[in-house]
């Protein structure tokens, strides 16, 4: 059987001025070799992807099992053929979560920058309404929203969701996360590490 799941070696790269260089002019992803030649900085998330994430790996395995259980093997379908369909289905299911997160981030960005609100019949309005209540109660000034931050001293960069003044904590670096919450929300060490990395890109030692 040929390899069904290939490792994802993609990464995000930036120039020292914060310009994204995730892809080449031909549309292909920027490789590590390209980055070394051009002196590009890796993103914070690309660096953190090196760290093992047991919870994420368990979730991926779970998605594969669910895909295998939910699909019926076609008559005369080979093991390889069925396995490929399982992997394709697993990838489709797994991509739904980040796609949802991207849409939520866009809605929040619009409100952070211009107080623009989605229509009440928008499927994301319920999530936005909860965020708006929190924002209006706690945020007094927005400095940056969906902005690339660069640390030239240590050679990394990344896109921060929000840098703003909080009524209790003062100037803060804020990152939004979406997840399927069951009994309670889950929190991971890499989230703290990501915030700490962004914090070192902002003058004045903000909170996070």
Predicted regions and their residues:
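Mg2+/Mn2+-dependent nuclease catalytic core
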Residues: 146-208
